[in-house]
Amino acid sequence: MSKAYEQAGVNIEAGYEAVKRMKSHVERTNRLGVMGTFGGFGGMFDLSELNLKEPVLISGTDGVGTKLKLAFMVDKHDTIGVDCVAMCVNDIVAQGAEPLYFLDYVALGKAEPAKIEQIVKGVADGCVQSGAALIGGETAEMPGLYEEDEYDLAGFAVGACEKSAIVTGERIVEGDVLIGIASSGVHSNGYSLVRKIVFADRQYAVDAIVENYEDLGPIGEALLVPTKLYAKPVLAALKAADVHGCAHVTGGGFYENLPRMMPEGLATEIDLGSWPVLRIFEFLKDKGQLEDKDLYNVFNMGIGFVIAAPAAEADKVMAAVEANGEKAYTIGRVIKGNGVVFNGTHDGSLV
C-alpha cells in the first residue's frame, strides 16, 4: 500500500481492520426484510415482508451531543452507541413506527480498530434492543478536524406503520391519562450543563465517589448509563390499548416535549410525587444549585417517555409496558390550557 495517505494521517489498514471487527456485531442485528450482504454500497430492506396494507415510513436522525465528551473522559465507548440508537428510535416510536433499520456515522481523528468496534458494538446492542437492523454506515477518519482521541457519532433510523395507525396526538382530549415510563438516568440530553456542574464547577474526577451519593458509584459511570430504548414496551402498548398520543422526553425536558404531542388548547397537568425521581437528578440539583424549573426544562427527571390514553385504557397501557420489563406510572392528565402545569412536590420520593 502507498504510504502517501498514511503520511497525511489516514490509516487505510486500520480502517479495514475496523470493518472486519464490526461484521459480527452487524450480523446479530439481522431481521425480517433485510436484503443484501455486509459491505455493500447501500443497505436494502424489503418493505413487502411486513405485509402492511398502507405502509408509511417514519424516519429520524440524531446524535449523542456532548455526552461523547464524558465517554472520552471515562474512556468507555461500548454503550454510547446505545444512546445514539435510542435518540433516533425513541422519536420514531413516538409516532407509532416499528423500527426497521438503522445507519450509523462515526467520524474520528484517528482510526483505532478496537475503539471503533466498541462504538459499533453499542450501536448493534441498541439495534437488537429495538428490533432494528444495522444495514449500513460510515466510518470516516478525519485527521485535523478531530483530535486523535475524539470522535463524533450520529445515526439515522427508519420505521414503518400502517397509515391508519400513525400516532399524531390529534386524538388527545381533555381527561386523557398521562402514563410515564421510567428512564434509566440522564439519557443523552443536558450534558453541557452536567459537565459544567460536575467537572468544571465541582471539579470531581470521573472516578470520584461523591460523599452522600456513594450509592451512585463512580460519578463518571453513573452519568454514562445508556439511554433507555422504548420501542418494545411502547409498541406493545399501541397494540394492547387505544393510545391517543406519545412523547419522547428528550432535550427541553417536560416543558418542551409534552406540548409537542398536544392539540391546540390542551395542556398536560403533571402530579409531582407520582413517580420516583432518580438519585442522579437529586445529585445534579444539589451540586448545581438548580431550581426545579431548570431541572424539568432540561432533564427527563426519571420519566423518559409519556403516553396519553383514555382513562379506561390506562391499565392496559401500563400492563403492556410492564410486561416488557419497564416501570410505568400514572403521572397526570390532560386539561384545558397550554403548556405544562405541575402539581405538588416530590416529597423526597427519590431512588
Swiss-Prot record:
The lineage of its organism: Bacteria, Bacillati, Bacillota, Bacilli, Bacillales. InterPro entries: PurM-like_C_dom, PurM-like_C_sf, PurM-like_N, PurM-like_N_sf, PurM_cligase. Pathway: Purine metabolism; IMP biosynthesis via de novo pathway; 5-amino-1-(5-phospho-D-ribosyl)imidazole from N(2)-formyl-N(1)-(5-phospho-D-ribosyl)glycinamide: step 2/2. One of its GO terms (molecular function) is phosphoribosylamine-glycine ligase activity. This is Phosphoribosylformylglycinamidine cyclo-ligase. Keywords: ATP-binding, Cytoplasm, Ligase, Nucleotide-binding, Purine biosynthesis. It is found in: Cytoplasm. The gene is purM. It comes from Lysinibacillus sphaericus (strain C3-41). The keyword Ion transport does not apply. Its EC number is 6.3.3.1.
